[in-house]
């Protein structure tokens, strides 16, 4: 599922940066458990939160996702808009 892939990718990138979940959370101006909750599938960041995470990690949003994740995301978005109608 998309959310699990997101959580795993975040943990992977954070560990590559060599920072704890707590320190990353606090650096982003969030509660101590913010990143931990995301990595353990208890929460998802807002779109703005996602952009802050990418900025903190020094990557672009597209670099966050691999091709398989992007396909899942596009599929999820397509399903959402088909179900809820397209808004202009």
Identify what each model region corresponds to.
Residues 18-37:
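Short alpha-helical DNA-recognition segment
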Residues 15, 29, 40-42, 69:
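Residue-level detection of the helix-turn-helix DNA-binding "recognition helix"
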Residues 48-63:
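DNA major-groove recognition helix of helix-turn-helix/homeodomain DNA-binding modules
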Residues 10, 21, 32, 47-50:
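Helix-turn-helix DNA-binding elements, focusing on the entry/boundary residues of the two helices
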Residues 1-16:
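A short, Lys/Arg-rich alpha-helix, primarily the initiator
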Residues 65-88:
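Short, charged recognition helix plus adjacent turn
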Residues 14, 25, 54:
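The alpha-helix within a helix-turn-helix
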Residues 6, 17, 46, 57:
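Flexible coil/turn residues that form the inter-helical turn or adjacent wing/linker of helix-turn-helix
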């Amino acid at each position: 599922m998309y959310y699990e892939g997101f959580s795993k990718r975040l943990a992977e990138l954070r560990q590559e940066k060599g920072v704890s979940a707590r320190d990353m959370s606090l650096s982003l101006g969030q509660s101590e458990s913010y990143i931990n909750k995301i990595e353990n599938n208890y929460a998802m960041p807002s779109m703005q939160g996602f952009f802050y995470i990418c900025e903190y990690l020094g990557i672009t949003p597209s670099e966050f996702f691999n091709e398989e994740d992007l396909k899942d995301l596009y599929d999820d978005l397509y399903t959402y808009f088909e179900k809820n109608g397209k808004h202009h």
